From Swiss-Prot:
GO molecular function annotations of the record: rRNA binding; structural constituent of ribosome
Cross-referenced PROSITE patterns: RIBOSOMAL_S19 (PS00323)
Keyword match Nucleotide-binding: no
Family statement drawn from the similarity comment of this UniProt entry: Belongs to the universal ribosomal protein uS19 family.
Alphabetically ordered keywords of this record: Ribonucleoprotein, Ribosomal protein, RNA-binding, rRNA-binding
Protein name from the UniProt record: Small ribosomal subunit protein uS19
One family name in Pfam for this protein: Ribosomal_S19
Any one cellular-component term (Gene Ontology): small ribosomal subunit
Entry function: Protein S19 forms a complex with S13 that binds strongly to the 16S ribosomal RNA.
Keyword rRNA-binding: yes
GO biological process: ribosomal small subunit assembly; translation
Length: 92
C-alpha cells in the first residue's frame, strides 16, 4: 500500500538538516545517512549521499530521475554471488 497523499513524503529531520547545511557551505562532500526509508526530495538534486547498507556507506549521486523514491533503493543490502553450480554437471 502506498503512502497517503495528504501526509506528504517522509524524510527524517536530520537528513534535511544535513542537506541544508551542505548546500549552505557550498562544499560537495558525501553526506552520511542511515535513513534508507527517507524519500528523495527535489532539494537533494546534485548532492551526494552516503547511504548505509548495514556494512558501509554507498555513495549515491541524486539526479532528477530519483525524486520520489527512497534512498534504500540505491544501496543494496545483499550480495548475490549467483546460484551454486551442480558439481556433477561441471565434471562432464
Amino acid at each position: 500500500m502506498t503512502r497517503s497523499v495528504w501526509k506528504g513524503p517522509f524524510v527524517d529531520a536530520y537528513v534535511l538538516k544535513k542537506a541544508e547545511k551542505t548546500r549552505e557551505s557550498g562544499r560537495n562532500e558525501v553526506i552520511k545517512i542511515w535513513s534508507r526509508r527517507s524519500t528523495i526530495l527535489p532539494q537533494f538534486v546534485g548532492l551526494t549521499f552516503g547511504v548505509y547498507n548495514g556494512r558501509k556507506h554507498i555513495p549515491v549521486n541524486v539526479t532528477e530521475d530519483m525524486i520520489g523514491q527512497k534512498f534504500g533503493e540505491y544501496s543494496p543490502t545483499r550480495t548475490y554471488y549467483g546460484h551454486a553450480a551442480d558439481k556433477k554437471a561441471k565434471r562432464k
